[in-house]
Structure formats: structure tokens, C-alpha cells
Amino acid sequence: MTYLSRSYSFYAAYHSNPVNIKIHQVCIPLLLLTALVLLHNFVITLINSKLQINVAHLVGLAYQIFYVTLDPLDGLLYSPVLYLFSYILPSKLFTIFSRSLVNRSAAVVHVICWILQFIGHGVFEKRKPALLDNLIQSLFIAPLFAFLETGPFVGYYPSVVSKIRANIKLKDVGENYPNLSEFLFPPSMVEDAVSGVVEDASQLSYCIRPLRLSDIDDGIVF
């Protein structure tokens, strides 16, 4: 399993509730944008040089290099978003509006998005946020994953998302199995078989489960 797959497995395990997923799809891009807007206030001046580097541009470039290293295709697809967030939008906002207004607005939106995400985890997901277990991974890779999860809306189905989500669905079904003594053979046998055959189990409209003794008693199996 690649580092990207392992990282998404970690992220997806904390984001399985549909409402919480939608909250993060909206809030994570806004968190990145507002953070870059605030970082746009700072510049780095090289020693013995008049050259100044905007911190927002530097952070955006670092994210871009990191994402392309993780996955060239998905990293390149996300590059216009990073360019927009780290360069175009901050520059336009500070040109059109006063610096104090932009900074205050960005800070407020940033805080609100964090609150909404904690609500998503506490109320809907009912599980602590991933950042409490792995802060660095959550902060750096979450924007790419939130972007990839919106891919199906435009007809793009990232393989890492569909495969990991399919495996999570199979595990969720396994956790809801009744008494294992009711089955003719272990549920794990079906999970392993299905995960190896079905490329995108998230598209299934039915549930695959092992045969139960009650199925035979009820005359379902002849």
C-alpha cells in the first residue's frame, strides 16, 4: 500500500458519516484559503538582497510539491486550486478591500470552520477528529483528500478514494453482523473475496453477506 493510500485510510476512518464528510468538504478548503490569506501578510526578505518572498506563496508551493510527490496526477489536478488560494484570491482581496477587513473576515471564517468540523465529529461522526491522533498528517494531507472526495461531482473518481471507501463499507457491514454462530462460515471470507473482485463496492446498491442458517430454514436457499 502506498503512502497516499495509507494516509487516506487513516483520514477516511475518521470521516465516514455523510454529514460530517460534507462539512469537511466545505470547511477544509475554506480553512486552507483563510490560512493562506492570513499568511499573505508576511514576507521573507533574503539576507543581502532586495528579493522578498511572500509566505503564502511559499506555503502554497510547498503543498504543491508535496502533493505531486504523493500522486502526480491528483497533485497536478489540485495545482490550480493551490494557485488560486495562495496567490490570486489573497492578492485580489487585499486590493479590493482594506487589509484589516480581510484579515478579520479570514480569521472569523477560519474559527467558524474549525467549530463546524468539531460539531461534525461530535454530533454526527461521534468520533474524535483525526488531528488529535496525527496533527501533521491531518493538516497537510486533508486538503487534498477533501478535494479528491468532491471528484465524483465532476465525473472524476480517484482510485484511492473508491477503493478505501469500499473497504470501509465492507468493514462497517462486518461490524453489524449478528451472532457469528448463525453463519455457515466466517464473514471475513466474504469480505476478502468481495474486496478482491468488486473494484468499487461503494457503488453497490445491495449488501453482500455470508449465508446464514436461517436463510436455509426460511427456504431462501434450495
UniProtKB/Swiss-Prot annotation:
EC class: oxidoreductase
InterPro entries: Mpo1-like
Catalytic activity: (R)-2-hydroxyhexadecanoate + O2 = pentadecanoate + CO2 + H2O
Cofactor (UniProt): Fe(2+)
Superkingdom of origin organism: Eukaryota
Primary site of residence: endoplasmic reticulum
Membrane association type: Multi-pass membrane protein
Protein family according to the UniProt entry: Belongs to the MPO1 family.
Record's protein name: 2-hydroxy-palmitic acid dioxygenase mpo1
Source organism (scientific name): Schizosaccharomyces pombe (strain 972 / ATCC 24843) (Fission yeast)
Name of the gene encoding the protein in the UniProt record: mpo1
